[in-house]
Amino acid sequence: MRPLAAETPRELLIEDTARLTPLFESEEFAVYLAPANAAPNVPREIGRLRELTFRAAGEGAGEPLDLDSFYPHYLHLFLWSKPGREVAGAYRLGPTPDLLPRFGAPGLYSSTLFHFRPEWFDRIGPTLELGRSLVRPEYQKQYAPLMLLWKGITRYVSDHPECAVLFGAVSISDDYNPVSRCLLVSFLETQKEAGLAGLVRPRRPYRRNHLTHRCELAVSGFLRDVEGLSAPIADLEGDGKGAPILIKQYMKAGGRVLGFNIDPRFSNVLDVLMMADLRRAPLPLLERCMGRDRAAAFLGRPARIHPAP
């Protein structure tokens, strides 16, 4: 494993953010969305923080930076800590209406993990690929960073409603107990989007093992949702972690599963390809993330009128 790259000089990051207009702000954070060339120093720092964060979670590629050939043509959503004057979190967004005409399916990061039959894109229509998420370790115990990043994603979708379907790979670290991983896979198998999953094939499939049958019985017997799954997983894990937070976020939005892949380049993480059609997401979730007026406009309905207290 190679040493982590040095931190990007703070003054360069401040210069980059000064050229951008935030999507929105809270007291502590500002949320920005920009192509790589609009803030040239930010992607490098995001790549450094991804490798730092992934290593801490038992993942990572062992390189100084987690930067790949997809960075130049993706959008970078990032969270800026105003008091800390540093990048606190990030997500990578790939709108397929922009990427597919220019690069075809190989221009999507997900295509390095899964084979997509051409009709998959015809069936699913315009989408927004999500991936490479991170929250800097110092901010991981706060609720706000991940929520603000999801608000940023839904803000983009509300401005580009043709990209109402989100999809991307969510990782389950090899640090999870084998029984925990087996329970997660067995539950997620019950959440497959049958019609579309048949059009996707993993490059390195997850293999059933001697635990699979027992896990399937456990899931069918008493585990009804991903929140219910978190408690037994937390009991199995030495650090008390439950189901991965991003899987829970997808499921709250009505997420469905498309397939599973093992990625040896990133410490054998298990990649779960997931999708969520925000047009079918619970209205309270959309209102919380987009705001009531934006959610109503996105869904093409009048805003709900709440009675005065």
Positions of predicted regions on the chain:
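Hydrophobic side chains in beta-strands
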Residues: 33, 79, 93-95, 132, ...
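Short, conserved charged micro-motifs
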Residues: 41-42, 142, 282-286
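C-terminal non-catalytic accessory extensions
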Residues: 271-309
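Short Asp/Glu-rich motifs
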Residues: 73, 269-270
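Conserved N-terminal entry element of GNAT/NAT acetyltransferase domains
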Residues: 1-37
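Short amphipathic alpha-helix that is part of the acyltransferase structural core
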Residues: 22-89, 95
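A residue-level signal for beta-strand positions that form part of recognition/binding surfaces
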Residues: 28, 90, 127, 271
